[in-house]
Amino acid sequence: MRLPPENLDGFSFLLLGKNCKISLVSGTRISYDAERGILFLPEKNARERLVKWLKEIAKRILSELTDEKAREMGTAYKSVSATSAKTRWGSCSGDNAIRYSFRLLYAPKEVVEYVVVHELAHTRHKDHSARFWREVEKYVPDWRARRKWLKDNGILMEIF
């Protein structure tokens, strides 16, 4: 991944591990053609609108995935939000409010699932003890490879 140019038209980035190309358009509506991998983005305030859209999409996708994984794990959480965090992919507060960086959307879905399971494991274990990692491993047996992907590629995910 490369840093985006000032003019975003034609810029490509990964969205859940799939190529997404920006096409600047006149008008006011953002639309995404998932089949073709094209994000139609209004020219006016394009960068700001893109980040807002990414946060909204991240909250929706990550809320759905967190619900699904929480049911699978038999655990509960208070809420889900998407932030602009650049130093943490996710966090779980003492009252089980979960926050994710919207930049997780740039990672493959399997990596996102690891972060979701990691944060949900914190609803039971508020540390990174052996019990915590056993909980993660129960639901994501290859968590080490997924965590390594984040460590190896995290810097590439700071495009917006």
Enumerate the language-model features and the residues they cover:
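Walker B catalytic acidic pair
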Residues: 119
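Walker B beta-strand of ABC/ABC-like P-loop ATPase nucleotide-binding domains
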Residues: 116
